[in-house]
Structure formats: C-alpha cells, structure tokens
Regions:
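Active-site core of PLP-dependent enzymes with the aminotransferase class I/II
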Residues: 1-19
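Active-site C-terminal subdomain of aminotransferase-like
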Residues: 18-24, 28, 33-106
Length: 106
C-alpha cells in the first residue's frame, strides 16, 4: 500500500529455477500502475512471466468481490480443491456490471 514494487522478473527467474509458480497480488495496483492500469506486472512488462494474478474489486474498482486469473494448466484443479472458493457464491449481475464499467473507465 506504500507503492513498493516487487522485482517480479527476478522472482520469476527464481521460481522457474525451483519449479515454482509466480502469483502476483494486484489488489492495490489496479488502475494505478501500468500503461492501461493493469497493475505492477504490466508496469514492469512481465505479465507473460506471471502464472496467477489476483486482486480485489473493493479498492480502485469500487465494488465488491475479487478475481484470480491464469492460463496455468493447473488453474482448473485449484477451482475444484480450494475450499474457500468452493463455498463462495457468484457475484450478483449488478456488481459484475458495475465492476465491468469501472474497469472500462480505468
């Protein structure tokens, strides 16, 4: 929350060396960092090195809920085994529409 940025490229190199994944929490950087406001990974031009990106809609987007996005091959299994996710409810359509519009404006 102080504007500090992790050295994502160096962390991704270490992760690759140790067969680990890279997860970036963009909760406080969406709408602030990056050419189009996508966050620190976009700012550092390393989005292609990130396996999982997560964030919240309750900060700069001004709604509620959150997200985790990934192209990682094991992403789908996480949706099935993560107990906090399994017991969540879908966001109401009005919240999704509000978040979508806020992201368009950002």
């Amino acid at each position: 929350m102080l504007g500090d940025q992790a050295p994502i490229k160096e962390l991704a190199e270490a992760a690759k060396k140790h067969d680990a994944v890279v997860l970036v929490d963009e909760a406080h950087s969406i709408g602030v960092f990056g050419k189009t406001g996508r966050g620190v990974a976009q700012e550092q031009e390393v989005e292609h090195l990130v396996d999982f990106t997560l964030g919240t809609f309750s900060k700069s987007v001004g709604t509620l809920g959150g997200y985790c996005v990934s192209n990682h091959p094991k992403f789908e299994i996480l949706r099935l085994v993560c107990r906090p996710y399994v017991f969540t409810a879908s966001l109401p359509p009005s919240v999704v529409a509000s978040a979508n519009k806020a992201l368009e404006l950002i």
